[in-house]
Amino acid sequence: MKFLYSDTQDYVDPEYNFTTDRNAPGRRRYWDDVYAHELMAPTPYDGLLVAMSAVRSAPGVATSKVRYSTSEEQRLLRDGVRKFLRFDGPKYKEAMMMGDCGSFAYVEQEKPAYDALEVFEFYADACFTHGVSPDHIIFACDVDNPPREAMGAEVLYRYDLTLENAREFMRICESEGFPFEPMGAVQGWSPQSIAEAAVTMEKMGYRYLAIGGLVPLKVEVIHQVLKTLREHIKVETKIHLLGFAKADSIQEFTGYGITSFDSTSPLIRAFMDEKANYYMPNGKGGLDYYAAIRIPQATENPRLMQGIKRGIFNPEDLQRRETRALAALRQFDQGSQGIEPTVEAIMDYQQFATLSGDDEKIGKNLIKVRQRLERTLTETPWKNCDCDVCAKVGVEVIIFRSANRNRRRGFHNLGIYHQHVQRILEKSR
């Protein structure tokens, strides 16, 4: 079971100055930056996935901060996706380089943003090893398996269109000599309809199926989908789970013969989760999660800046508290200060970033923040990690502040998660 990371142009400045919070002088975005697989050894994933919607704009495709520029798209197609992502060379020769359409980006549109020929040409030109047929997401999944006649026109349209696209995509792949391994995108409104679509795609010639629409589903529903799917398709047919948001529960799904799955969850949680920002193995076959220590930049954090503009906060006072909080944490890390004064210095600044709602809500939020902070400082997980990120930057990895720290923490999470998946596989053999 291979773990693929879905690329969102996540790279960091290897020479970033954490003391001044500045990039290296003359640093050029991308060219001087490094991806997780360049910063860490071993590589923190088994392959990469790139969504066409992140690379190529089209009518109806939602805009994104991680959208490739026109010049980046041209370079990717000219040099190939492996070279562009610097995921080339003998080390990555056998690693999956998978493409999909990024159907979330056009989910509100009547039809997919790209047709089968456009998608094929994108995969072939960029030299992907695997490519998913264009699909249209169906979000609902009813485990009661309602019949086709009970479904609305929109659901049936998306279901039938996804199958039609898969048929045309396979026809093109066959006529062009299969420059990559085609993967059939499977959608459905129930476990039974998903299984039936999968069987239809097997008959088209697909030997690798990519199961979509899983993101909003609960774990027990995904179990039902995979159980029904495996009861219908051939034993040798490979399964990929698209955008598997339940990555922390992957150990529950080893019995379904899953070949691969992709997820951004370990990296995204580094800066999007309220309390699970830093991963560590718990020694019992699972993972522990720690809250990062939030010390935002006083003159760049949106909430603090809003308070400054409204005259609620004094910028000089905020910066003094910010400086004290950072100094206290670094002194604690060096062993020259205890937990309690460190907590007080950080909370003295944190209270301003927590201001929202009424006094009672603020008070409850601050109590939770303090409890998470005390746990993180008591257990000092960054001191117990020997990954390349933690070994080099130390306590900076646990500070929730600036993209260069937060992404590094995400890289650490990818490495810990990849090792977690490998341990699960070893136990299941």
What are these regions (language model features)?
Residues M1-E174, D333-R370, R429:
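Non-catalytic, usually N-terminal nucleic-acid engagement modules in DNA/RNA processing proteins
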Residues K2, E176-E344:
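Glycine-rich phosphate/ribose-binding loops and adjacent secondary-structure elements
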Residues V55-R56, S103-A105, H136-F139, W189-P191, ...:
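Short, solvent-exposed loop/turn segments at secondary-structure junctions
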Residues G89-K91, E176, I233, E379:
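A generic structural signal for short, solvent-exposed coil/turn residues
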Residues E154-F169, S193, G410-V421:
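Charged, low-complexity, helix-prone segments enriched in Lys/Glu/Asp/Gln
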Residues K275-R429:
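C-terminal accessory extensions appended to soluble enzyme cores
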